[in-house]
């Protein structure tokens, strides 16, 4: 298992934006939907962060988001 930012697909490499006011709800549900233990909205970059993601789950790699792929 790993702790990291989930991405929509490995090729696109785009994190999931979130509203920092929604402390646990959206990201926690998103992460659990990807079989993680829990998740939250990281305030400094307003992106979902997951704890306990399966090792084969796509996560943020270095480089930019490619929304057009």
Swiss-Prot record:
Where does this protein have coiled-coil stretches?
none
Tell me the SMART domains matching this sequence: Knot1 (SM00505)
Q: Which InterPro entries match?
A: LCN-type_CS_alpha_beta_dom, Scorpion_toxin-like, Scorpion_toxin-like_sf, Scorpion_toxinL, Scorpion_toxinL/defensin
Q: Name one GO molecular function term.
A: toxin activity
* Subcellular locations according to the entry: Secreted
List each copy of the LCN-type CS-alpha/beta domain by range: 2-66
Highest taxon of the lineage: Eukaryota
Entry's CDD domains? Answer: neurotoxins_LC_scorpion
Tissues expressed in: Expressed by the venom gland.
Cysteine pairs bridged by disulfides in the record:
14-65, 18-41, 27-48, 31-50
Question: What Pfam families does this protein's entry cite?
Answer: Toxin_3
Q: Establish whether keyword Secreted is in the entry.
A: yes
A Gene Ontology biological process noted in the UniProt record is: envenomation resulting in negative regulation of voltage-gated sodium channel activity in another organism
Which residues constitute the signal peptide according to the record?
none
Q: Identify one Gene Ontology CC term for this UniProt entry.
A: extracellular region
Keyword terms: Disulfide bond, Ion channel impairing toxin, Neurotoxin, Secreted, Toxin, Voltage-gated sodium channel impairing toxin
* UniProt similarity note: Belongs to the long (4 C-C) scorpion toxin superfamily. Sodium channel inhibitor family.
Give a short account of what the protein does. Inhibits voltage-gated sodium channels (Nav). This toxin shows insect lethality against crickets.
User: What's in the domain note?
Assistant: Has the structural arrangement of an alpha-helix connected to antiparallel beta-sheets by disulfide bonds (CS-alpha/beta).
* Protein's name according to its UniProt entry: Toxin Tma3
Task: State the species of origin.
Answer: Tityus macrochirus (Scorpion)
């Amino acid at each position: 298992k790993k702790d990291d930012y989930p991405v929509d697909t490995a090729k696109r490499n785009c994190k999931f934006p979130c509203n920092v006011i929604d402390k646990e709800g959206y990201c926690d549900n998103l992460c659990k939907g990807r079989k993680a233990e829990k998740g939250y909205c990281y305030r400094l970059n307003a992106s979902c962060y997951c704890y306990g993601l399966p090792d084969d789950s796509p996560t943020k790699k270095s480089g930019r988001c490619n929304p057009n792929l």
